Amino acid sequence: MYFQKKETFFMPLTKDTLTFECETGNYHTFCPISCVAWLYQKIEDSFFLVVGTKTCGYFLQNALGVMIFAEPRYAMAELEEGDISAQLNDYEELKRLCSQIKKDRNPSVIVWIGTCTTEIIKMDLEGMAPRLEAEIDIPIVVARANGLDYAFTQGEDTVLAAMAHRCPDINSVTQNINIEDNGRERLLSFLPSKEKASNERKNESTHPPLVLFGSLPSNVTSQLTLELKKQNIDVSGWLPSQRYAELPSVGEGVYVCGVNPFLSRTATTLMRRRKCKLIGAPFPIGPDGTRAWIEKICSVFGIQPIGLEEREKQIWNSLQDYLNLVRGKSVFFMGDNLLEISLARFLIRCGMIVYEIGIPYMDKRYQAAELALLEKTCQEMNVSLPRIVEKPDNYNQVQRMRELQPDLAITGMAHANPLEARGISTKWSVEFTFAQIHGFTNARDILELVTRPLRRNLSLEQLGWTGLVKRNKLTA
C-alpha cells in the first residue's frame, strides 16, 4: 500500500443534501459465520453447527479462540472429499453429528450454519433439516450465513430471519390464552379478588404488542426495555430470546422494531412472511439516537413521551470530558460492519467532522429514519453533510485520506497497520460490534473507543515520541 497524490480522488463535502455514491471495491470484511461468536452466548440453550471446510474451522478458532476448557456450544461439521464428490451420505453424516450433540449437550435447538462450500456443492440443508428434526426430536434451524454477504454482521441477520419463521403465531397463542383464562375464571368465580386481578391483567397493556429484534447483551436489553416501560410501553419479547422456548409471538397486529442497522433481512421476513408492522425508527445508538428511537415508538402508539429531553441532556452533561477531546476532530469511515451511519451521526452530534462514510451495503428503506436523523443532525450542528460511499474502493479511499488527513480512520483490521504506518490514527470497526453501544448509558463506551487513539497520540506528543512517524509518513 502506498500513497499517490491525485486531486481527482478528493470530493468536497456537500452542504444541502446527502450524497450517495457507489464504487466497485472489494469487500474486506470478516466471514458472516463469525455471528456464532455472540449468538451462541445470547441463546443460552442453543447449539450452532457450522457446516464447512477446514478454512471455516481455522477462522472460528482464530476469531473465537480455542476455548478448550469452556466447552462452547458450537462445533464444525467439516466437509471432506467424500462429501464434495457425493461418495458419502450427507443426511447420515449430519444425523450422526446431531445425535451426538443431543447426547452430549441436549440443546433446545440446533442451528445449522451454511457456508460458501455448502452453497457451491448445492447441499440441501433446508430439505434435510425437517426430516432430521422429526427423527431426533430437536428443532433444527437452517441459516446460510456464508461469505457471499456484504458484511460479517449480516450473519446475525440471516440467523434471526430463519428464527422469525419459528416464532409462534400471535393469533393461536392469544386464542389458547383466552381459553385458559375463561376456564380459570369459571373455576374461581366465587373468588372476587381473583376475578378482579384477571381483569386488571387484561387491561395492563393499552397498545398493540411490540417485539424488538436484534441480539444485544441481557443487561442492554433490560435497559432498553426499562426505558420503554417508563413511557408506559410494554415489550412483548425480543428476537432472539435467551431461551428458544421463549421466542416472541408474532403475526398480524404485532409491531416490530429493530435495534441494529444490519437487520434488513429480518425486518423483511417479519413484514412479508409473518405480517408484522415495522416501526421505521433510528437506531438506539448514542443519546440522540436512543431518544429518537423511543420517540418514534411512542408516536406510533399515540403516546406522549415524558422526560426524554431531560434524560438526553443529563447523558450529554456526563460526557463532557470526552466531548472536549473529540470536538473539532475529523473522522473517516472506511466501511466494515454496517454500523457506520449510526456511529457517524452520533460523532457529528459530539462535534466531530465526518469526511466520508464508507459502507459495504446500504438498504435505504430500512435505514431511512437513520439517514433522516443524520441529515437533521448535520443541519442542527451547522456542518456539511458527509459523502456516503457504498462498496468503497479501498485504493480510492486511501487517496482521499491522503488529501483530507483525518484525525481518525475507523477501518477494518486489514487496513489498520498500513494506515498507522503512514501517520493516520485508526480504530478497528469490529470493536464497535462487540462493545455495548446501545442505549443512553452506553454512549460513554462509544467515546471510550473513539478517543483511545486520540488520547494515545496526545500522550506520545507530550513525550515527544511522534516525530519519526510524522516526518516519514508522506514518503512511505
UniProtKB/Swiss-Prot annotation:
Pfam families: Oxidored_nitro (PF00148). It is found in: Plastid, Chloroplast. It comes from the Eukaryota. One of its GO terms (cellular component) is chloroplast. SUPFAM superfamilies: Helical backbone' metal receptor. [4Fe-4S] cluster binds at residues 31, 56, 116. Pathway: Porphyrin-containing compound metabolism; chlorophyll biosynthesis (light-independent). One of its GO terms (molecular function) is oxidoreductase activity, acting on iron-sulfur proteins as donors. Signal peptide: none annotated. Keywords: 4Fe-4S, ATP-binding, Chlorophyll biosynthesis, Chloroplast, Iron, Iron-sulfur, Metal-binding, Nucleotide-binding, Oxidoreductase, Photosynthesis, Plastid. InterPro entries: LIPOR_BchN/ChlN (IPR050293), Nase/OxRdtase_comp1 (IPR000510), Protochl_reductN (IPR005970). Its main location: plastid. One of its GO terms (biological process) is photosynthesis, dark reaction. Its EC number is 1.3.7.7. Its cofactor is [4Fe-4S] cluster. It catalyses: chlorophyllide a + oxidized 2[4Fe-4S]-[ferredoxin] + 2 ADP + 2 phosphate = protochlorophyllide a + reduced 2[4Fe-4S]-[ferredoxin] + 2 ATP + 2 H2O. Binds 1 [4Fe-4S] cluster per heterodimer. The cluster is bound at the heterodimer interface by residues from both subunits. Protochlorophyllide reductase is composed of three subunits; ChlL, ChlN and ChlB. Forms a heterotetramer of two ChlB and two ChlN subunits. Belongs to the BchN/ChlN family. Component of the dark-operative protochlorophyllide reductase (DPOR) that uses Mg-ATP and reduced ferredoxin to reduce ring D of protochlorophyllide (Pchlide) to form chlorophyllide a (Chlide). This reaction is light-independent. The NB-protein (ChlN-ChlB) is the catalytic component of the complex. This is Light-independent protochlorophyllide reductase subunit N. The lineage of its organism: Eukaryota, Viridiplantae, Streptophyta, Zygnematophyceae, Zygnematophycidae. The gene is chlN.
